[in-house]
Structure formats: C-alpha cells, structure tokens
C-alpha cells in the first residue's frame, strides 16, 4: 500500500497552522501558518468605535475558516502529496473558545442585526469578563453540595462555557434568545467541514461540566442559578457528545474543493490543543505529566481512579486517551509573562546590546540569566500575570515580584519570572502527587521547550524530575493528525486506536533535562518561600490584589459613570 497521510490543523491564540503528517512514522512533510486577520479583539469591535470592557477577549470566526482554505492547500502544494493519499483531517483548538450560532450554524456576529453586539462574537479562552458568573456558579454549587464541583478542583473557571453563556444571558438577553446553540470553536470548525454539528467529549467534559456517566448538572441546579437557564443543557447545549478519535463526518465537496482535498475523507471530532499533544509525545499510560508550553501551560496526566485534586481544571473519563481518566491543570500565563517583560520591562540599552550581538532580546536575557546561580538574584515572583488557573482557580489574582534593589538587573528579573512559572508547575505536581495521582516524569511540548533550554532546566530542578521534550515542534497538530488517522481507520491506511498511532507516530528527543542535585536543594528553599507568598496572597489572608483590581475596574469606566 502506498504511504498514507493525514492533516492536523492547530488553532492557537494568534494563528492557525496546518501540518501534513506521514502516518508510517509521524514525520511532518509540510506545515503552513495563517495569522488570524483580526487577531485577538480586546480593545474595539472591528470597524467600529465600540470599546470592549475590561478583560474581554474576542475573535472573528471567519479567521478560522481562512486557515483551512489557506494553510491546507499550502501544505498540499509544498509536499507534493497526491490528494488521493490523504485519508483524513483533524483539528485542535484553544478552549473554552465559544460562540453563539443560529439554526444554520451561522455565528451571530455575521448577522447584520447582531454584529455590533460584542456578545455575538467568539469569546476567546482568555476572556475573563465572566468572573462574577463563575463566582456565583461556585457559590451555588457549594451551597447545594453538587457532586461535580470536586471534579473541577472545587472551582469552575470564568474561562469555561457556563460562565460565558450566563454572561451573555445577563448582559445581552436578545443574543441569548436568538442563539440556537452555544458551541466550542473546535466543534464549530468541524461543522464547517462536515455540514453537521458533532460535540466532542473533551471540551464537554473539561469546559462545560459534562460527565460521561452523569451528564450535565441537573436542570434544578441551573434553575437555582437563574430561572432562565433551567433548560440550557437540553436546548442550547443539546446534542450527542462523541469520544475523541471518532469520525465526525465526511469532508463536504465545497470545502474539499477550497482545501485541495478529496470530498468524503474522514474528519475527526474536535479536540483541545493541549490534549491533542499527549499522544504526540507517545504518552498513553499514567505517571507521565505532559506540559503543553506556550503563552500558557496546560498540564495533562492520565490516571486509573477518579480522585479529587485541589485546583485541577477537571478529570474526564476518556477525556485525553480512551480507557483512562484524563486529569488537567494549568497556568494562565507563562510565555506571555516573558513576552510582557521583554516588551514593557526592558531598557533600550538591552535592546541595543541584543542588536549588537545579532540575537533577539529573549536569547540575550536567557544567556545572561543562565550565568546566575539559583537564588543569586535575591528575587522571588508569583506567576499570576493572567490570574491563577491551578491550583487556586482565581482570575482576580495578579502578578508580584519581591526583592528589587537598585542593583537589580534585567536578566535577574527574567530568571525570577522563569523560576516563578516553574514554582507554579511544582505546586500542580505536588497537588496531584499528594492525592495519589502519581507524577514520575515530565514531558514538554510546544514553543517554549524548543527555544528556552534554561527554562527547561529550571523546571527539572524545581520539580526534581526528568523532563523529556517532544521531537515535533507541532505536537498539537501532530496529535490532531493522529486522531484523524484513527477516525479514518486501518481499512484505508490509518489506525484503529490512538495507542497504535502513538507507537508509530509519537516521538521525543534523545536529549533530556535531568535535575541538578545542588540546584534542587536551593530551589527547595525558594519554593517554600513561594508557597508562603502563594498562600498569603492567594488564599484570603491578604486580598490586596483583588482590591487593586476592583479599584482599577472602577477607574476603567467612562468618566460619565464615575459618580
């Protein structure tokens, strides 16, 4: 049989990427990136003077379609592969990135009567303006003793589906009423390829409080939140929920023509970017924590028993690999913190030095920071620049840096920020391990492990665990392509399980990062100081961060409202 291929399409925060994969060995033959034309919409609605509120983050749904019609033909052209040999396509997406659609699956923001209402647009994963709704959900769930709450670490996030839906209902009831279904973007883009809406078990479980055995929370719970929400799950969240690796449908002829593929090939059900990466590094068994590292980190771990772990984002049966419980935790900002510092916290002299040496500022700071010993800077940071996802699940927290002096240098700050993100991961590892969900080794994928060796060594030292790094630079896309091979099946040259696909296609580099014992000892002391700050500012002893944010929010309002 001739070699067969699938395509994985990875939808990130700023762009989408298509990768063409050889199913015999997981090698990437071609990849292409399409930046989102509208990017992240967080100031004004496109082509209007309508200003968005504090902590809003929207996107334009047609940017997602453009990825399919631009990047997929590009990888076909670059590779020279015959369309007859491409047997399937799979996608992964940021989550919870959601949108309201009408009866035809049309996003409401594309309808003339709703285009000027921000609530009709795609709400990106990092839209945090529904925090008050998340707080109310958590309070009600705790008051009623809802069984689902411990499965999400005791708190539902403002980033997730129900909080965002409730915000729409409360602030734009006309949009809510016009909505036929609220969809994850990953399910919506699959529907654009297949002509039918199929919902995946991953986002339903991790982002919409769905349980394989129990379903959604009861109508009574939703009625207690808001009587208008009573029938939400049987109306606007209705539909069958399908396991990962299943075939959502065949590629529509009109989309096939635009994408340069054959109509009818398998389209896998949607997936989440981070979760798709797990089999791409060959992980299909427990004890191995996979970190998808980029602007943020998503931590994923397989287990055999359902345990309650503080601050986990969820535990979902078959949520990552069929046959296991999939645990998820995360950090809301990692690469974003380093990028923020380089953009806003570095002097012109540092930029000049980088230019003279012919390197970028990140590389210069990494090189200088690598010459420092652990603890040498005298600095300690809390990595909450975009709130805390795990283990505190609180978007109202903010970043902190302690220990500045007049002698503090940029590279010292940079290293302290790297260390802070490692401490955040250590807190997550300890939370899992302490509840019997064992973590023996770490796997890293995404952009950061490929670029920043110092960061990976610090993570190994702080967690005192060996770290293996993905051989692929595009692990979510590779994982999406692997699930596409399962959706296609062995009869046409694919695989019959994700475990089979992972054995052939999942890969890690030969080089690993091992803990350095003398560094481990120093970082243990620093980590204990981190825990002290973490608990003091994060568990209610001093809510100064929240008070500052509240004051900022008041001052952010138009002057006419400041009375």
Curated annotation (Swiss-Prot):
HAMAP family given in the database record: Ribulokinase
A single BP term in Gene Ontology: L-arabinose catabolic process to xylulose 5-phosphate
Organism: Halalkalibacterium halodurans (strain ATCC BAA-125 / DSM 18197 / FERM 7344 / JCM 9153 / C-125)
GO CC field: cytoplasm
Name used for this protein in its record: Ribulokinase
Catalysed reactions, semicolon-separated: D-ribulose + ATP = D-ribulose 5-phosphate + ADP + H(+); L-ribulose + ATP = L-ribulose 5-phosphate + ADP + H(+)
Its EC number(s): 2.7.1.16
Membership in a protein family: Belongs to the ribulokinase family.
Annotated keywords: Arabinose catabolism, ATP-binding, Carbohydrate metabolism, Kinase, Nucleotide-binding, Transferase
InterPro entries noted in UniProt: ATPase_NBD (IPR043129), Carb_kinase_FGGY (IPR000577), FGGY_C (IPR018485), FGGY_N (IPR018484), Ribulokinase (IPR005929)
GO molecular function: ATP binding; D-ribulokinase activity; ribulokinase activity
Annotated pathway: Carbohydrate degradation; L-arabinose degradation via L-ribulose; D-xylulose 5-phosphate from L-arabinose (bacterial route): step 2/3
Residues of the signal peptide: none
């Amino acid at each position: 049989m001739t070699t067969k291929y699938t395509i994985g399409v990875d939808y990130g925060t700023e762009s989408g990427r298509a990768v063409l994969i050889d199913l015999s060995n997981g090698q990437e033959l071609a990849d292409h990136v399409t930046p989102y034309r509208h990017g992240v919409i967080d100031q004004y609605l496109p082509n209007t003077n309508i200003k968005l509120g504090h902590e809003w983050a929207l996107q334009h749904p047609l940017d997602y379609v453009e990825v399919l019609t631009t990047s997929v033909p590009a990888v076909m052209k670059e590779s020279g592969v015959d369309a007859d040999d491409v047997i399937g396509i799979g996608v992964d997406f940021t989550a919870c990135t959601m949108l309201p659609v009408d009866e035809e699956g049309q996003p409401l923001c594309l309808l003339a009567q709703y285009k000027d209402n921000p609530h009709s647009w795609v709400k990106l994963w990092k839209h945090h303006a529904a925090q008050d709704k998340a707080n109310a959900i958590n309070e009600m769930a705790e008051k009623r003793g809802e069984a689902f709450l411990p499965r999400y670490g005791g708190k539902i996030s403002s980033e997730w589906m129900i909080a965002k839906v409730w915000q729409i209902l409360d602030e734009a009831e006309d949009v809510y009423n016009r909505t036929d279904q609220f969809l994850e973007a990953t399910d919506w883009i699959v529907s654009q390829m297949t002509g039918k809406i199929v919902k995946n078990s991953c986002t339903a479980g991790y982002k919409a409080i769905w349980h394989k055995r129990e379903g959604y929370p009861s109508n009574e719970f939703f009625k207690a939140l808001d009587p208008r929400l009573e029938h939400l799950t049987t109306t606007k969240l209705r539909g069958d929920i399908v396991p990962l690796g299943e075939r959502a449908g065949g590629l529509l002829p009109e989309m096939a023509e635009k994408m340069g593929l054959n109509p009818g090939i398998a389209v896998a059900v949607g997936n989440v970017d981070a979760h798709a990466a797990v089999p791409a590094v060959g992980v299909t068994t427990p004890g191995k924590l996979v970190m998808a590292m980029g602007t943020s980190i998503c931590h994923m771990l397989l287990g055999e028993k359902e345990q309650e772990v503080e601050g986990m984002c969820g535990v979902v049966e078959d949520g990552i690999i069929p046959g296991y419980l999939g645990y998820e935790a995360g950090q809301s900002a990692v690469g974003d913190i380093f990028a923020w510092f380089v953009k806003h916290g570095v002097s012109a002299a540092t930029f000049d030095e980088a230019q003279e040496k012919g390197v970028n500022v990140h590389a210069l700071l990494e090189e200088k920071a690598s010459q420092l010993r652990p603890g040498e800077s005298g600095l300690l940071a809390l990595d909450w620049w975009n709130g805390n996802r795990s283990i505190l699940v609180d978007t109202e927290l903010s970043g902190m840096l302690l220990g500045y002096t007049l002698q503090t240098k940029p590279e010292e700050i940079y290293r302290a920020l790297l260390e802070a993100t490692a401490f955040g991961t250590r807190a997550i590892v300890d939370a899992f391990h302490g509840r019997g969900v064992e973590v023996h080794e770490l796997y890293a994928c995404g952009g950061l492990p490929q670029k920043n060796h110092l960061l990976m060594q610090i993570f190994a030292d702080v967690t005192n665990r060996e770290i293996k790094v993905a051989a692929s630079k595009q692990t979510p896309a590779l994982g999406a392509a692997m699930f596409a091979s399962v959706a296609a099946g062995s009869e046409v040259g694919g695989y019959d399980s994700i475990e089979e696909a992972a054995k052939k296609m999942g890969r890690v580099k030969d080089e690993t990062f091992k803990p350095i014992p003398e560094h481990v000892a120093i970082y243990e002391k620093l980590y204990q100081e981190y825990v002290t700050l973490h608990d003091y500012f994060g568990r209610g002893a001093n809510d100064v961060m929240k008070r500052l944010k509240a004051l900022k929010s008041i001052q952010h309002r138009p002057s006419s409202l400041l009375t």
